[in-house]
From Swiss-Prot:
Function: Involved in the conversion of a cis-olefin into a trans-olefin with concomitant introduction of an allylic methyl branch at the proximal position of the precursor to both the methoxy and ketomycolic acids. It directly affects the cis- to trans ratio and indirectly affects the keto to methoxy ratio.
Similarity field: Belongs to the CFA/CMAS family.
Active site positions: C268
One example of a Gene Ontology biological process annotation: lipid biosynthetic process
InterPro entries referenced in this protein's UniProt entry, alphabetically: CFA/CMAS (IPR050723), CMAS (IPR003333), CMAS_actinobact (IPR047672), SAM-dependent_MTases_sf (IPR029063)
Binding site for S-adenosyl-L-methionine: Y32, T33, G71, C72, G73, T93, L94, S95, R96, N97, H98, W122, E123
Pathway: Lipid metabolism; mycolic acid biosynthesis
Single GO term (MF): methyltransferase activity
Protein name in the entry: Mycolic acid methyltransferase MmaA1
């Protein structure tokens, strides 16, 4: 099996900004992905837990199973999986800050289940697991690795294995034109800004990039649930939280970082509302 090296540097430059900065706009779950506002009156924390539950419920988890979280962030889904679903968990991350906080949070649970975070990429992971979940990590992968990711995921799952991929994706110009959605120079500059200043090396997949490669690896796409407007609302909440903590944010990082993040959060919210970007949970079965 060819050895692929994870892109540690890109992930660490994106996420190893001070945790104190992210704490200013994230909720207590420390989940940095699209929330699911199942009810209009939900707080951001409630909606983040609802999103994690929405994903984990689709995996048909049973107590004692082992769940792999690819790109586990600060461990929010890992903690939820152990506490609510009574499973063993392994979280993979390329970010040292994510790894340290995830490790500490799992150690504080006091479970008899195996619960670990690893500073490791999926490219280096070869153990068998029962289920796989991944929240918005796929859109940081390189297109040339999409098929390999799905093939390796397929290989480490049992015959009744299930994977839940929660990912952003974008559309090609032709589809946008057919839908009457204009792609402007401002949009192109914004995407360039995201790649250079917020998510170095990031490249949004298309829906066919996800579906076609997953099917080529052997997966069946059982269900796709779109969450586009939920992300617009999530981004609004993050932007409001960060704006309210402007002085502290600048003190913790810098005015440039604060301005970049406000531009990113508000700009993404606008583009989700216009339909340029989408996000979905793809339920895959072996």
């Amino acid at each position: 099996m060819a050895k692929l090296r994870p892109y540690y540097e890109e992930s660490q430059s994106a996420y190893d900004i001070s945790d104190d900065f992210f704490a200013l706009f994230l909720d207590p779950t420390w989940v940095y992905t699209c929330a699911y506002f199942e009810r209009d009156d939900m707080t951001l924390e409630e909606a983040q837990l609802a999103k994690v539950d929405l994903a984990l419920d689709k995996l048909n988890l049973e107590p004692g199973m082992t769940l792999l979280d690819v790109g586990c962030g600060w461990g929010g889904a890992l903690v939820r999986a152990v506490e609510k679903y009574d499973v063993n968990v392994i979280g993979l991350t390329l970010s040292r800050n994510h790894y340290e906080r995830s490790k500490d949070r799992l150690a504080a649970i006091g479970t008899q289940r195996r619960a670990e975070a690893r500073l490791q990429g999926w490219e280096e992971f070869e153990e068998n697991v029962d289920r796989i979940v991944s929240f918005e990590a796929f859109d940081a992968f390189k297109k040339e690795r999409y098929l390999t990711f799905f093939e390796r995921s397929y290989d480490i799952l049992p015959d009744d294995g299930r994977m839940l991929l929660h990912s952003l994706f974008t559309y090609d110009r032709r589809w946008l034109h057919e839908q009457g959605i204009a792609l402007t120079m401002s949009d192109l500059r914004f995407l360039k800004f995201l790649r250079e200043s917020i998510f170095p090396g990031g490249e949004l997949p298309s829906e066919p990039d996800i579906v076609d490669n997953a099917q080529a690896a052997g997966f069946t796409i059982e269900h796709v649930q779109l969450l586009q407007q939920h992300y617009a609302r999530t981004l609004d909440a993050w932007a409001a939280n960060l704006q309210a903590a402007r002085e502290r944010a600048i003190a913790v990082q810098s005015e440039e970082v604060y301005n970049n993040f406000m531009h990113y959060l508000t700009g993404c919210a606008e583009r989700f509302r216009r339909g340029l970007i989408n996000v979905a949970q793809f339920t895959m079965t072996k």
